[in-house]
Swiss-Prot record:
Protein name (database record): Translation initiation factor IF-1
Subunit: Component of the 30S ribosomal translation pre-initiation complex which assembles on the 30S ribosome in the order IF-2 and IF-3, IF-1 and N-formylmethionyl-tRNA(fMet); mRNA recruitment can occur at any time during PIC assembly.
Taxonomic path: Bacteria, Pseudomonadati, Bacteroidota, Flavobacteriia, Flavobacteriales
Gene that encodes the chain: infA
Keyword terms, alphabetized: Cytoplasm, Initiation factor, Protein biosynthesis, RNA-binding, rRNA-binding
CDD domains: S1_IF1
Protein role: One of the essential components for the initiation of protein synthesis. Stabilizes the binding of IF-2 and IF-3 on the 30S subunit to which N-formylmethionyl-tRNA(fMet) subsequently binds. Helps modulate mRNA selection, yielding the 30S pre-initiation complex (PIC). Upon addition of the 50S ribosomal subunit IF-1, IF-2 and IF-3 are released leaving the mature 70S translation initiation complex.
PROSITE patterns membership: S1_IF1_TYPE
Source species of the chain: Christiangramia forsetii (strain DSM 17595 / CGMCC 1.15422 / KT0803)
Length: 71
């Protein structure tokens, strides 16, 4: 069985949690918990509440996401 593709969404960071986790509100109003991708960690990209970001979500668990880009 092939792995399903990730779902890409845009959102806004609401709150910074511990361990580089963030609470993000999607454009459709849903709130998810997201962590920073490895490349963003490697390049020391800082995120603050209010930043617009691009997220990747697994089709299996729509409450968790990975932040892949900051606008």
């Amino acid at each position: 069985m092939a792995k399903q593709a990730a779902i890409e969404q845009d959102g806004t960071i609401i709150e910074a949690l511990s361990n580089a986790m963030f609470r993000v509100e999607l454009e459709n109003g849903h709130v998810v918990t997201a962590h920073i991708s490895g490349k963003m960690r490697m390049h020391y990209i800082k995120l603050l509440p209010g930043d617009k970001v691009k997220l990747e979500m697994s089709p299996y668990d729509l409450t968790k996401a990975r932040i892949t880009y900051r606008y």
